[in-house]
């Protein structure tokens, strides 16, 4: 929005996703002509997201070849817990991933952590020990037992951790601290482990935030091809069969454009990409899938979205 006078500000840029006009005039004759400008890029690749050999960063470990690692967001920064190859643990934090400047130190925990269970929301971090005991921390120094035993942590929803607990041989949905969740027995086809990262969305069509998790491994040991959604109270199957059965995939927010009703501009809207993960035969999933309707339906991404040949074998990005 607004006007640009290129005689005065020759370095200004224009956002062509909206309606742009060019006004040409001759002051001497008090004549002007208005042109509507459009930028057509149909001869170019529609999506310039491409993988490059140099587009990588090393894990912020103290030693080489770490055994396990998981990174979450807490207090506006990335927090990474790393199990080193000598059995010690590193806690690394970074408030600017573009600068790739990590602060890291060896951390001694009063328990053996299940590194893959790490989850955080706002100012609180949750983690399970190797026996399933739940711990919390708000300062990354003091870990307090929550007095609960869980099978797994699915992720976080607003200010609480979401997971699964077991009682008398039955599995139930769990939440800490307890809010409005219906902590009923989980369905037989609900993934008990290996689901994707837990992502949250909210728009004008949702009365409360909705969290999604894709695929994973069910209690019977079989892998799931479903996407589950949680609205703060109940779980439902959002998509069934739209993805191949796998575990450890990653959900990543992305965006796309569609024409406005008038056709005069383009409107940006969010989409979800799913990449990585391991298939039932143990092979790495090399296909990137995309959902334009918040996880209800899934399609194979455009060729430019697919992994390049340089990432051969089993690339090391999958969620566990």
Language-model segments: what does each one mean?
Residues 88, 222-224, 283-286:
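A detector of repeated loop/turn-to-beta-strand junctions in beta-rich toroidal repeat architectures
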Residues 49-61, 69-108:
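Beta-propeller domains
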Residues 47-58, 100-110, 138, 144-151, ...:
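Beta-propeller fold detector
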Residues 92-99, 136-137, 174-177, 229-230, ...:
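Conserved Ser/Thr-centered positions that define the repeating blades of beta-propeller domains
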Residues 58-73, 108-123, 145-162, 188-206, ...:
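Repeated scaffold domains used in trafficking and secretory/extracellular systems
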Residues 1-64, 142:
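Beta-rich interaction/scaffold domains
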Residues 69-85, 117-130, 153-168, 208-220, ...:
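Short beta-strand elements that form the blades of beta-propeller/WD-repeat-like
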Residues 286-287, 292-320:
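Blade-level signature of beta-propeller repeat domains, shared across WD40, Kelch, NHL, RCC1
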């Amino acid at each position: 929005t607004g006007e640009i006078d290129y005689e005065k500000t020759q370095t200004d840029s224009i956002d062509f996703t909206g309606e742009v006009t060019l006004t040409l005039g001759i002051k001497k004759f008090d004549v002007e002509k208005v042109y509507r400008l459009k930028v057509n890029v149909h001869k170019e690749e529609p999506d310039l997201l491409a993988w490059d050999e140099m587009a990588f960063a090393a894990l912020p470990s103290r030693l080489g070849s770490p055994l396990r690692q998981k990174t979450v967001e807490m207090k506006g920064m990335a927090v990474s817990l790393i199990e080193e190859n000598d059995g010690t643990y590193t806690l690394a934090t970074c408030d600017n991933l573009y600068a790739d400047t990590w602060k890291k130190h060896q951390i001694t925990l009063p328990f053996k952590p299940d590194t893959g269970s790490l989850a955080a929301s706002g100012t609180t971090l949750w983690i399970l020990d190797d026996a399933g005991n739940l711990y919390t921390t708000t300062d990354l120094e003091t870990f307090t037992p929550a007095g609960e035993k869980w099978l797994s942590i699915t992720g976080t929803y607003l200010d609480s951790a979401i997971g699964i607990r077991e009682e008398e041989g039955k599995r139930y949905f769990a939440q800490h601290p307890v809010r409005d969740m219906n902590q009923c027995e989980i369905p037989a086809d609900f993934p008990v482990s290996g689901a994707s990262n837990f992502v949250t969305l909210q728009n004008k069509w949702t009365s409360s935030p909705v969290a999604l998790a894709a695929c994973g491994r069910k209690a019977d040991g079989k892998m799931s091809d479903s996407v589950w959604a949680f609205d703060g109270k109940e779980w439902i199957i959002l998509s069934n069969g739209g993805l191949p059965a796998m575990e450890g995939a990653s959900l990543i927010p992305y965006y796309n454009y569609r024409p406005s009703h008038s056709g005069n501009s383009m409107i940006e809207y969010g989409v979800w990409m799913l990449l990585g993960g391991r298939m039932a035969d143990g092979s790495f999933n090399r296909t990137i899938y995309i959902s334009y309707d918040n996880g209800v339906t899934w399609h194979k991404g455009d060729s430019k979205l697919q992994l390049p040949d340089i990432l051969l074998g089993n690339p090391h990005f999958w969620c566990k």
